[in-house]
C-alpha cells in the first residue's frame, strides 16, 4: 500500500509552507553566508503560544556548540500574555535539534576557520518551530560598502531597463 497521497496532506492543512515568525536582517548585512541548515527548536508550551502570536526577536541571537549540542542563545521570545506562573524566561538558552553528522561537520568547520553560527529566520514548518541556521564569516567594513554599491548599481540598471521598455529614453 502507498504511503499516502499529497492531496490528503494538503487538505489537512500541513503543506510544505513556511510561516515566518522573525528574520535576522542584520545577519545578512554583517556576515557572508557560507552554508545554511534547518534545525528544530526545543521549546516550552508558552513559548510556542507566544510564537503563534508572531512575537520573537532574533536581533542579538547566536548559536554555540557545547559538549556536542547546539544551543541558541539570546533569542527573545516574550512571555505569553495569558500565561500564569508557568511562563518561560524570555531569554533562556534553547537547544537546537540537528543530526549528529551535521553537528560534527559544524564543529569541524568552526574549529578550522573563523566562522560563526547565526540564526537567519524563525518559522513554522508543518506545525513545528524551525530555525534557519547559517554558517557565516564576519564581513569587514569595505565588504559591506561593496555590497551596498553593487545593490545600488543593480537597482539603477533595473530602473533604466524599466524606462527603456516604457519608451521614456
Swiss-Prot record:
Listed InterPro entries: SmpB, SsrA-bd_prot, SsrA-bd_prot_CS
SUPFAM superfamilies, alphabetized: Small protein B (SmpB)
Record has Cytoplasm as a keyword: yes
Any GO MF annotation of the entry: RNA binding
Record keywords: Cytoplasm, RNA-binding
A Gene Ontology term for the protein's cellular component: cytosol
UniProt-listed GO biological process terms: trans-translation
Keyword Cytoplasm: yes
Subcellular location field: Cytoplasm
Pfam families according to UniProt: SmpB
Family: Belongs to the SmpB family.
Protein name: SsrA-binding protein
Organism this protein belongs to: Mycolicibacterium paratuberculosis (strain ATCC BAA-968 / K-10)
Gene for this chain: smpB
